[in-house]
């Protein structure tokens, strides 16, 4: 676009253009490539001037074939870096990226590429162990039927547990009645025992008092009416029944 619009020259450089570019850089130094075409009086773009200087006209550039040491270093660097020619040329002093690329494509690529291709083919041929595909069991949902089915309900119903299991050979009602009767009899016995104990205590006190009276009063003494102080035994036991005692 730049060459077509401004009529810039393209193609091979002449000796006159090389001398003008060399004089300009020696005078102003490297850099500011956008000003080089104007200062040198060249009808070239700045990119063309820069590449011409770095690849061909720079005084530190080495010309000729690469030495054996340089070829060995080029092979090792190419194994590490690949086709990064600018990085490889930076490690080969005096060699440009264009020179390194041209030398590789002309002398070394045909010797080393077949070996690389064979290695790549061997790598491709080696089978990769593959695990068999697992079968995914798909479970489809089944619609539920809400119709009443006696057979299904009978099968699916949970087992019934009897809260009050029947006793072996016994009737529950009879057992309950017997237990109630037993408790009533037991309460009656306790009540009678308590009454007897209380009556015995009362009787003991009564006998003690009667003995004291016998000591103080002789047995032969009688009342004014002639009655004795002795009590009837039947009247004494009638006290347990709650009846009143009448003295004769």
UniProtKB/Swiss-Prot annotation:
Q: What does this protein do?
A: Transcription activator, when associated with BHLH12/MYC1, EGL3, or GL3. Promotes the synthesis of phenylpropanoid-derived compounds such as anthocyanins and proanthocyanidin, probably together with GL3 and BHLH2. Regulates the expression of CHS, DFRA, LDOX, and BAN.
The entry's protein name is Transcription factor MYB75
Write out the tissue specificity statement of the associated record: Mostly expressed in mature plant aerial part. Detected ubiquitously, with higher levels in rosette leaves and flowers.
The UniProt record lists the HTH myb-type domain at 5-57, 58-112
Q: How does it assemble?
A: Interacts with BHLH12/MYC1, BHLH1/GL3/MYC6, BHLH2/EGL3/MYC146, and BHLH42/TT8.
Keywords from UniProt, A to Z, are: Activator, DNA-binding, Nucleus, Repeat, Transcription, Transcription regulation
Tell me what gene encodes this. MYB75
**Keyword DNA-binding listed:** yes
Q: Where the protein is mainly located, per its record?
A: nucleus
Q: Indicate the impact reported for residue 147 to S.
A: In strain: cv. C24
């Amino acid at each position: 676009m730049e060459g077509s619009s401004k009529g810039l020259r393209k193609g091979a450089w002449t000796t006159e253009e090389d001398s003008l570019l060399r004089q300009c850089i020696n005078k102003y130094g490297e850099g500011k490539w956008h000003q080089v075409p104007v200062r040198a009086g060249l009808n070239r773009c700045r990119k063309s001037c820069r590449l011409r200087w770095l690849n061909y006209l720079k005084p530190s550039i080495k010309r000729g074939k690469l030495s054996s040491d340089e070829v060995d270093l080029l092979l090792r660097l190419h194994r590490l870096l690949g086709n990064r020619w600018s990085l490889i040329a930076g490690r080969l002093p005096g060699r440009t990226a264009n020179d390194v690329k041209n030398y590789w494509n002309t002398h070394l690529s045909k010797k080393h590429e077949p070996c690389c291709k064979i290695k790549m083919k061997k790598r491709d041929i080696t089978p990769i162990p593959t695990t068999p595909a697992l079968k995914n069991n798909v479970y489809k949902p089944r619609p539920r039927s809400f119709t009443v089915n006696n057979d299904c309900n009978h099968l699916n119903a949970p087992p019934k547990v009897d809260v009050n299991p029947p006793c072996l050979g016994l009737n529950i009602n009879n057992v309950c009645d017997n237990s109630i009767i037993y408790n009533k009899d037991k309460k009656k016995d306790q009540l009678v025992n308590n009454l007897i104990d209380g009556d015995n205590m009362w009787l003991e006190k009564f006998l003690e008092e009667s003995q004291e009276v016998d000591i103080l009063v002789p047995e032969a003494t009688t009342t004014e009416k002639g009655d004795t102080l002795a009590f009837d035994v039947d009247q004494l036991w009638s006290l347990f029944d709650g009846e009143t005692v009448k003295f004769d």
